[in-house]
């Protein structure tokens, strides 16, 4: 099959969250199975320095009046995956991140920036002769590429199957109606059964309603988003299409995330050399100037610092546990108030708490290898990848039972690989953390859970066949 895979971020070129990890790994896994996959993504500032020399370019014109759209053909050196980069200086050459300015405010022209990406994607899918390659299927990801389904609908194209994957329903890419005329889409699409969304228009809703299949990144999340509690205003539309909605769990690239061969951690280890995890723990504590007592647990957070992630709850419970000797290592950024609260916690417990604001890939590996337990108390979690990384590193996740966390972390029975709580409350989180501390001091029980965790296979190889079956069902 020839699969055109569109995303707004792709690891290792650019990453703000789990979408980049998926977009960087699933196409590689599909190519290993013999399928012809090509990626498309904007040429953000600095991206051209990270790819192979440009092999071919084509000018798609200036449909949005902001400058010519150039499609550049190249590949990602790390895995040889072919990629088309959409270049437009006015839209993508910015020093800030891909979506927001340095103050964390959405770019005012995001509707045009990602309409252009979507338009180019749809054009490429429809007119394969432009690059001498005709896609059999188009795979879109989140709202930034969802508009591509609307362009194909607007152009009355029916012969190209479209799959849209929702990585997080909360980011619906909705815009004011007075911006719609700039999109060059048919006004016929602006209705409650189309891309209209509570008096606005939405890129995500376009991607949902005009797709042949909709996927989410875990089976439990696929069920949750049919309810008002988790549906973020789209549950009605999703219930109407639930016959073409499926949850496929995200995978992990174990070439990147495996303690046996991870070049970013001080001491490699596997299930038979778990004592080396203690060496990583000591190295992490020393790196951060924290108390080096190996007989007390170290909890970790690698996350966006937001209420969605439940990280306000961690702030409520942590002081009581720190008083008993626990440590906390945090890596993340997000809500400015939460950032300041975590930094204040660090100031109050300088020998027990380390906080780094931002995201640093190499440090996240050292953190996963060095902590004992990873905190993920999310109010909702479409899939979650950090708990999958943690499991492979023998780091036990402490999670709220929601979305992909419910599909991958279990507290009891033969599958036990972490700690689980149900209610999104500080009390429930603290009880789970106290259970983990009790288990930590029972070395045999703790190591049994660690070994269970490390045996789970959440590799992309294990889930790729589900994607192939879905694609084939749509093409046939």
UniProtKB/Swiss-Prot annotation:
Disulfide bonds: none annotated. SUPFAM superfamilies: UDP-Glycosyltransferase/glycogen phosphorylase (SSF53756). Its EC number is 2.4.1.21. ADP-alpha-D-glucose binds at residue 15. One of its GO terms (biological process) is glycogen biosynthetic process. It is an enzyme of class 2 (transferase). Pfam families: Glyco_transf_5 (PF08323), Glycos_transf_1 (PF00534). One of its GO terms (molecular function) is alpha-1,4-glucan glucosyltransferase (UDP-glucose donor) activity. It catalyses: [(1->4)-alpha-D-glucosyl](n) + ADP-alpha-D-glucose = [(1->4)-alpha-D-glucosyl](n+1) + ADP + H(+). Pathway: Glycan biosynthesis; glycogen biosynthesis. HAMAP family: Glycogen_synth. Belongs to the glycosyltransferase 1 family. Bacterial/plant glycogen synthase subfamily. Synthesizes alpha-1,4-glucan chains using ADP-glucose. This is Glycogen synthase.
